[in-house]
Each structure stands twice: as C-alpha cells, then as structure tokens.
Amino acid sequence: MWTTFIPDLLVAVFGAGLTVLIAFLTFRHQLKVTERVELNRLISDLNLRRVLHEITDPRLVHGAKDIDDFKHANLSVLDIREHTKRVGHHLRPNSPAQEPVSGLIKGCNRYLEAGMYEPEKYHFHPQELRSEVQACINKIAAGDDRIKPLDPGSSAY
C-alpha cells in the first residue's frame, strides 16, 4: 500500500489540477460566448431601430418638441442607451468590445443633448448618431468574425 502512495498522490493532484484547468477554460469560453450572443442581439436591435434609419432628405422641423415623432425618437435612443448599458455588464474584463460599447452610450448621450438644445434639427441628429453607431458596430465586428456587422436602421422598414 505505501509503495504506491506517492504515485497515487501525484495522479490525484494532477487530476485535480486538470479538473480545475478544464473548469476555468470552460468558464472563460462561456463568458466569451455570452458576450458574443449579447453583442449580436444588440446589433440586431440597432438594425431594426427606426430612429437609425437613413433619412434621405433631412430638414429643419420647427416646433419639433411638440411632435410625437421627436418624442418617439428620443425614447428610442434612451432605450438603445439602456440596452447598451445592459450589454456592457455582460462584457468580459478587458474585452475589445468595451470601447465601442462605451462609444455607443456616448453617442446616445450626445444625441439626447443635441436634441435638447436644437430640437428643430432632429432630422440631422439621428444621422450623426447613425454614423457613430455604424463605426462602433464595425469595431465590435472586427474583433470577432462570428459577430455580424448589420447596418443600423436598415431593417426598420
């Protein structure tokens, strides 16, 4: 019995170490898969947003604060910002997607601020946001070939 104690102990320690390593690698893989799923959902949501659909003839709209479309656009951007924040909670530490996801939130903040100060230009502000969103989507997709870079607002209609 004592003649095999050291080899048995080594095998047990090696097996335990291997188990911990496999569990750690599985955990890391699951984090990456969850991140990818959340990013794809976010991009799909952005693809369906009417507020991000390209406006071919933007114009000044006087009295925009009283128009329902202006209010709906702001609510949509608020929803985009909140959805993006929730996705940010699913990102891995040091994920390459953290910077573009933060950029999406900042773009939404800029849109909302611009709409507050220049509501009559609310046809122009979504186009600026759309450009920022497209750049962020491209950065996110560049880091992972399983993330589809859909155009924001292109499937809204």
Task: Show the residue positions of the predicted features.
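Membrane-embedded hydrophobic alpha-helical segments
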Residues: 1-31
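Amphipathic, membrane-active segments
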Residues: 24-82
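Alpha-helical rod/repeat scaffolding segments in eukaryotic adaptors/tethers
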Residues: 59-70, 91-94, 119-126
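Short, solvent-exposed, charged loop/turn and helix-capping segments
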Residues: 82-101
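Cytosol-/stroma-facing membrane-proximal "stalk/adaptor" domains immediately downstream
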Residues: 95-157
